[in-house]
Amino acid sequence: MAIVKRGVRTKNKQSQQPSKSGIKKAEFDLHKKKEVGVSDLTLLSKIADDAINDNLYKRFMNSTIYTYIGHVLISVNPFEDLGIYTPEHLNKYKGKNRLEVPPHVFAIAESMYYNLKSYGDNQCVIISGESGAGKTEAAKQIMQYIANVSVDDQVSAGGDGGISKIKDMVLATNPLLESFGCAKTLRNNNSSRHGKYLEIYFNPSNYQPVSAHITNYLLEKQRVVSQITNERNFHIFYQFTKHCPPQYQQSFGIQGPETYVYTSAAKCINVDGVDDSKDLQDTLRAMQVIGLSQDEQDNIFRMLASILWVGNVSFVEDDNGNAAVRDESVTAFIAYLLDVDAETLKTSLIQRVMQTSHGMRRGSTYHVPLNIVQATSVRDALAKGIYNNLFDWIVERVNLSLQGSGAVQEKKSIGILDIYGFEIFEHNSFEQICINYVNEKLQQTFIQLTLKAEQDEYVQEQIKWTPIDYFNNKVVCDLIEALRPQPGLFAALNDSVKTAHADSDAADQVFAQRLSMVGANNAHFEDRRGKFIIKHYAGDVTYDVAGMTDKNKDSMLRDLVEVLSTSSNSFVSQVLFPPDLLAALTDSKKRPETASDKIKKSANLLVDTLSQCQPSYIRTIKPNQTKRPKEYDNNQVLHQIKYLGLKENVRIRRAGFAYRTTFDKFVQRFYLLSPKTGYAGDYIWQGDDVTAVHEILRSCHIPDSEYQMGTTKVFIKTPETLFALEDMRDKYWHNMAARIQRAWRRYIKRKDDAARLIQSAWKNKTHGNQFEQLRDYGNGLLHGRKERRRMSMLGSRAFMGDYLGCKYSSGFGRFIMSQAGISDSVIFSAKGDILLSKFGRSSKRLSRIFILTKNSLYVIAQTLVQNRLQVQKEFTIPVSGINYVGLSIYQDNWVAVSLHSPTPTTPDIFINLDFKTELVTHLKKCNPGLNIKIGQTIEYQKKPGKFHTIKFIVGNTAPVNGDSYKSGTVTVRQGLPGNSQNPKRPRGAAGKVDYSKYYNRGSNMRSTSSYQPPAVSKAPQSSRPSYIQPPVQQTQQRVVPPVQSQPKPQAQRYAPPDTQPQTQRHAPPDTQPHAHPEQAAQAAQAAFHHTAPQAQNTTQRKVPPSAPGSYGQQAPTQKPSAPSRPARKTAPAPPAKKNVAPPPPPAAASPPPKPKFPTYKAAYDFQGTGSASELPISKETIVFITRKEDNGWWLAKTLDETKEGWVPAAYVVECDPPANSPAGNAKSPPPPPPQLNSASQAQQSQQQAQAPNGAGLSNGLADALKAKKSEETNLAGSLADALKKRKGATGDSDEEDEEDDDDW
């Protein structure tokens, strides 16, 4: 993303709060293994080789083969299929950073692909380790992951563009090049006998894979003609000879592998775990995917057949002691396969053509016969030359298919290096020194890019750092490749070949003589007469001098090239052996390039390529030499741990930094995370990059210990911090979109609420309130026949019906519906009690849930089974089967539901319900023929055919707001007359619209981040903290303070509304406007079913009282404002100055008397719960505090000492006494009356004399309305207290008379 600078906007913007964090749904991983050891070696308590080895052993035996050292992956070859490369495992690593998932090669691949897309840097992975450690498999899995992920990203984005074809071709290179370039060795069944560097190129605009390229390094062509015992030739020869396609068997004369010398001499044809038939099918399929035509495939297999038959050419000695072909039919068949003259081919195998020259003149030509040894060498050179050129052509042909359209000029790449591992055999020759040289170069690259480069960078950037010693193998690389000041081994080989070009034995002797000069004063080299030792980083290796110079020549005899150039097959004469190759051999002025020159050039080019990329590292370890699973050789692994330098890597990683980048790149990447550097996606910072980096890190709350600032770069210490930054950046646009969506939804919600409010008001105006109409209908059913409760006669009482919220999509009511299996529409739902007689026991009053639908009345029971809530339908009573309902004439809540034909499963029920009148009303609506019996007694059938009568009496022993049941008798207090009517619903207090419910309640949440920074205090920008909000009325259980006459209040803290929203109180029913029926139902249910706790939880956390604004954060203390004073009169102008003595100073005013109680000011509005023991106060009201309790309640008294009550300690702050307080101005004349700006001052003015004028009349009317409202509030507020006392006396079981005990 390019930085586009824009000037700072002049519009004053509110500080944007971080978006509310979202938590992803947790998923249980069935395949997750138990963690064994540590997944990152930097977490080891002891840094030692033995500790590393022990940790790797534990994880290996648990089939956990991957471990991290920071961002370096350690892989131990399991020698078995663990099932960890399936598509399911691959999908688990998509879009995940390495800390979210277990260590895996897929995590390295994901990190490479993410860095490529995010930062635009070329990526590469360097896979190192000895032969058989699993390098090839790791490279294959990385290719598999990147190919799949890059294609999936483009397909999900809605486009393909041929990338699937590129993916298939990239993956097809694995089986094709493995067949032609890998073989079975003593250490590895699939050992790479060549080096391969695959680069996948991506379009930088959309990171779509557009092409690929493979670079080949030093094929071990000697393996074509000879192998060590129990090793094999290249895989393709066994695949071809064992399962040759039918069309090739006749035309190419292919037989079994035991027929040919090149495939049978090592006595190893079959390998355990290798299916040559399947591998051949994969190879043929890969050829088709890459795009090889049928003619090209025929020519490939023709060349393979030629090589096999060339190996079967044998020689005998003629009469002159020269070599002769034993069976000329074999050479004739080879000539047929190569399309050359048979006699010419035979002659080139047993004779050598030599030419002499004299200056510029052409000399003589000689035909020199060869002996058997020389002829065998020429035969093998022919086979090696054909296979080497064939392999090079296959790589070039694959690159031709992978190059794509080539329309994109600038490309980004991911490189995967799969190269031969370090080798130590009993006899080591030129191939081993080349392989080990390349591994030394890779080790040097690893050191330079990790250990040395990292420490050098810390010094250069002036970062605090403790240097760590390590072994730098540059001295070994110079021993092999150096030209000056002291020539290395490769230079000595080239000089030996140049000195004795014609005689290989003489050249070997010259090379042996030069070794003493090569290893002079070098501690890593030893000369051993015909052998020499090089002390590599992986161990000491002994090399044989014999045959090295001949292998270094790396060129075919001119005689053989001339024969092949005459082939009538263009694939042989033009493709494999083009004319320019013969011209180069003929030109005697130019020395042919040797094999050592090629490998040195290729290795240096590889190092240059890798140094231009951001590297990732995989260090592979071979656990044993037997290639058996679950076998761990401690000594062998410990040796690899030491020479790989894992201990030094762990030490540097623990002391180093996980991420570093230049200041400008960091700002360009993360400027969105700070409101000072980015706004709406634009870069608005006007300062330098260093300050911008500080602002970004400060805005993200990154501690100073997590980063250091260098001279040109910023260094992030832990990867967790980097992942947190990346996570916040990824979610930036999502949060911005969510913020816009919230604003739009608030706007729509506000319009919708306004429309609903208008519609509700209009419906109530024209048609009346349906819930109040239903209430009036129900009151008419009982009018004059039953005493009424005071709570039922409130003007705000309405029959809402569904008090449990069964109609909602979620919540308690919906839970009960789903558990009980009720699907019908609910008319009425509430909690209550039922009187049940148990077997052999007296009747007991039990809690139940009652749900009424159009057809049935359900009685729901809740039980705890093994601490789990079980909900079941206890009774299902059909509404049409109800004969009558029985009620008493008193104000109790009991009602009997009697059926026409009761059964044991559907009996008559005797229930206690706060909303009994409403239930009877709904039953009457559903069943118009229902009888309502009201009398002194209630009769119902406890069992079918057995009637039971309940008596009702009036007594003062009953609870004030309830009743008591004992032995078939219900005692209740006297209620309101039966002809009482509900007053009109009181109008809500006029005031401003509460827009706080439309505000963004998640605005105070920080941005989502896996990193949790410490809180950073900021200076407030206003006199009042922004996080303090007025209390929001909610229908939740309220806290009832104790009355003054009762003992000390319980340990219940009353916190301010901004710190404990869960304790916010709801308004009394008569003060809540019922704009929505659902909200009114919830409010009424919460009021009628409120029960006070019997005992407070003694383990509840106590919050010490403190001033508002200091709850968890630092807030400024707001001083109380002084009461308003009368306006001062303008002082008259001073008289003209005269020379008179100044008057004496006035006497000091007497200090105001100290009040007898400390004064406190209300920081919030406290409306109270309606209890008589509370003192409602308004904000800014000043009161006396006469008593302080430890439970959070303080006893307050108004300044005029006319009212006293309890207030929450967290709602008041200490302040100075006002100047007009009774204690503060007792000895001074009272000032003019202040303006009415508080509740206490309003009460004082109410007690003053009333003036008989219009103003006094209006004030009196206002006072009367306030008094009426206060009275109704107190009446409604005592509802919960009445219900609490009423229910408290009826919770236990009671004994019935003896008549009930014989029910069983």
From Swiss-Prot:
InterPro entries: Fungal_myosin-I_SH3, Kinesin_motor_dom_sf, Myosin_head_motor_dom-like, Myosin_TH1, MYSc_Myo1, P-loop_NTPase, SH3-like_dom_sf, SH3_domain. It is found in: Cytoplasm, Cytoskeleton, Actin patch. The keyword Protein biosynthesis does not apply. PROSITE patterns: MYOSIN_MOTOR, SH3, TH1. Residues 734-754, 755-780 form the IQ domain. GO terms for cellular component: actin cortical patch; cell cortex of cell tip; mating projection tip; medial cortex; myosin I complex; plasma membrane raft; prospore membrane. Residues 36-730 form the Myosin motor domain. Pfam families: Myosin_head, Myosin_TH1, SH3_1. Residues 1-12 have a biased composition (Basic residues). Residues 1141-1156 have a biased composition (Pro residues). ATP binds at G129, E130, S131, G132, A133, G134, K135, T136. Keywords: Actin-binding, ATP-binding, Cytoplasm, Cytoskeleton, Hydrolase, Motor protein, Myosin, Nucleotide-binding, Phosphoprotein, Repeat, SH3 domain. Residues 788-978 form the TH1 domain. Residues 1029-1052, 1072-1096, 1120-1140, 1217-1227, 1236-1256 have a biased composition (Low complexity). Residues 964-983, 1001-1012 have a biased composition (Polar residues). One of its GO terms (molecular function) is hydrolase activity. One of its GO terms (biological process) is actin cortical patch localization. Residues 1292-1304 have a biased composition (Acidic residues). Residues 413-496 are annotated as: Actin-binding. Phosphorylation of the TEDS site (Ser-364) is required for the polarization of the actin cytoskeleton. Phosphorylation probably activates the myosin-I ATPase activity. The modification Phosphoserine is found at S364. Residues 1155-1217 form the SH3 domain. SUPFAM superfamilies: P-loop containing nucleoside triphosphate hydrolases, SH3-domain. Type-I myosin implicated in the organization of the actin cytoskeleton. Required for proper actin cytoskeleton polarization. At the cell cortex, assembles in patch-like structures together with proteins from the actin-polymerizing machinery and promotes actin assembly. Functions as actin nucleation-promoting factor (NPF) for the Arp2/3 complex. Belongs to the TRAFAC class myosin-kinesin ATPase superfamily. Myosin family. This is Myosin-1. The gene is MYO1.
